Amino acid sequence: SHVQEKIAEIIVYLEAMRAFWTRAEEEARENAFGLLVPDRGALDGARNLYPRLYPRLREILEQIGASGLITLPSERDFKGPLAPLLEKYLQGATLEAKERVALFRLAWDMTLSGFGARQELYERFFFGDPVRMYQTLFSVYDKEPYKERIRAYLKRALSVFAEVEA
């Protein structure tokens, strides 16, 4: 279903961030002062990727929640004359109505509330201007090993072509 696909997308992002974390720890090196410093490449990858992932995560929650994020009854509604109907029609396959509404309320707080909007803005810019962060990463990243791999590949490919033509 589309919900499973969207949740799987969230899982992919989670596992990517966990991989950055693991690499940052496992490839940490001691600096000149004897302090353990996390791997720079993993940190740069995470701090450049997450601000772009967060808006997508928020969007996925909005898509999954759909109209359930808009029509949220209050606690007072559950104590009023509509309570039996709310309990009946708002229950989920695995959740009682109040639990389901609480889950939707949490999703609403994370997506549609003022808090959710501020949080997205915060996540987008916490590490700095995203364009400058990418520019900085480009300028400090050691691209030479990858250029060398491409040169070696092209050299091998050209030698194969030369053998075929001979």
Annotate the PLM regions.
Residues 1-29:
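Extended amphipathic alpha-helical segments enriched in small hydrophobics
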Residues 4-9, 36-44:
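Short, charged, amphipathic alpha-helical segments
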Residues 24-35, 83:
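Short acidic (Asp/Glu) and glycine-rich catalytic loops that position anionic groups and cofactors
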